[in-house]
Structures are given as structure tokens and as C-alpha cells.
Amino acid sequence: LEQIMADPDWFGRAPESWYWGDDSNTVFYKQKQLGNPLRDLFVKSLDSDKAAHQVGLAKHHIVADSDAKKNSVRSHEIYSFKGNVFVKNGVSQSGKQITYTSATESNAMFLTNGNIAYRVGNVFYSHNLTTGQVVELANLQMAEKPKGVEEPASYLAKEQHKLISYIALQQRNSKLKEQQKADLEKQNDTITTTKYYFGKDNRVSHASLSPAGDKLLVSIATAKSSRDKSDIMPNYITKDGVIAAEKVRARVANNRQYKETLFFIDLNKGEKSALSYQTLPDFDKDVLADVKRENHAREGKEYKSKKQARNIHLMQMWFPVKWNSDGSQVALMLEAWDNKTRWLAT
């Protein structure tokens, strides 16, 4: 045991993170280097008696498709490598780099119309592989929707507009510019108007684009951290020898209640609507009523149970949202914050 703890390589450097190649007859895996924490990628053909050989770094983007998604006829696959999108031909195994940016493109997928889609931050794009045109589908803004030019509300403000012609003129000019901008966006279809506002101090917990690229399901949560300022632990082993206060997870007793709000966005109509949890069975059930009643009885008190909406959110899993093939229906995995109920909803 002492030898293993002192030198983990002595115990062995077993293959890690293996996955099948596109031909279903090749296996890729990673292996730790001797004496350091770096991992190398290896490939082994099952048709050959030759030992596995290392994949060169210059070719990692070609074989980094373990999480690739195929198109409807399964002739091509799409995946991301180091923030860029690649499309590979399933027959010739030739790959094409679609994006070459410093941004991080993720959630790459094929759409039912033959285009591809991907996400950069909270912005979703559609990319036509034939013409090269990129279309912004949705821009999720964690801010309040701009109110535009407002009329004076207070008595003092109204008097200012009456008595000072310059202020009234500025107000009129601002309204004219705002109206012209609105007319331009409405009448000129080359201008993108895909911003959707979800209020400040919020964050996108999960967002899923439909295979047709015409719908978006978004889960919004508060941006407030689950940790408090006091959730720290001293770290005595640091680079400079100075004791550091490391942020750690919240104490169990201080764990705040957590919930998410679901929104459905019709990208064709440009409409956003909140989804209600009230159709879920037991969404307002007092699931801990027996425990609370027992605790109250211990203190000589009587507990009166009452129905109250529970804190519900998407399950913390890889794919809590699943669309059908044409994007006309969607299924969700939901759970309550109290860990007493889960729902599979459509």
C-alpha cells in the first residue's frame, strides 16, 4: 500500500476512457504517461495482431468524435473539438472543419432541413453547409427587456416638458428614432431580432433546441450562488506557504431551496411563454407532513399541513430534455428539491 501511494504508476497504467471507432472494429483509449499525469490517446484495430499505437496530436480532431451526433440518414456525423465544430463523412471518414474561432461552439447537431446548429454561450446559430450562411436563431439575454422611450410620469417631469421646449424636443426626437428603428426591423428581414429577455440576476440552467430548429426549451434559475461567504475551509498546503481560504460547498443545514422556471420559445413566431408545474401530480403536496407532525408533537404542538407549490427543477443528468425526431414533441425529466418526487413529463 505504501508503494502504491508513493508511486501510483507501480500499480499499473490501465487504459482509460475507451470508445469505439466509426467502423465498430477499432478501439480508442487513453493511457497515463509514466511519471506524470498526462494522458496519451491510443488506437487498436481488432482486425490486426499489431499492438496499439499512439494517435498523433495533429490528428486528434479527426478521432475525437465519441459524442458525435448523426444526421437522419446516418451518412454524416457532427461533433465539437476544442470549441470548434466538425462534420465527418461516415463513408470516406473525411472530416471538414466548419468553424475556426476563439469562441466555444457547443451542442452541435443536425437539423431536419439539412443545416447544422450549435451554441455559443447563450446564443444559438443555424449554419447552412451549402451556402455557408449563418443565422442567429435565439439570443438569451439575462437582463430586463428595454422599456424604450417613456413618457414623463411625475408632475415635475411633465412640467419640465411643458416649460422647457428643448427637453420636449429631445423627447420627440428620441421617440422618432425609436419608431424608425422598430419600423426598419419590422420591414427589413435582413435584420436579426432574436433576443429573448429573462430578467437580471438569472442564469440559463439548461437550454435545448428542437431538431427542426424552430423551438427552444429553456430552464432559468437565479444566478445567486448556492454558497455563502462563510462557506470556506483553510488550505494549509499552498504554493507560497501562506494559508489560503478555499471556497467549499454549502453546509447541509444552510442549503438553500432551489428551483427553476421553464420557458417554451416559438422561434418562428418570436414568442416566449412560461410553463406551469401545476399539471404535475403532487406538485403542491406536503411530502414531509408526517415528519413535521411528529416533530411538532414532540414539542407538544399541533402541525397543520397545507398545500404549497414545491421547488421543482430539471434533473441533474446528462440529457434531461429529449425531443422526438421531427421536434414536434419533447419529454422532460423533473425532480423536486426535497428529493421525494420525480416526474417524466411531455
How does the language model describe each region?
Residues 1-346:
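Beta-propeller folds
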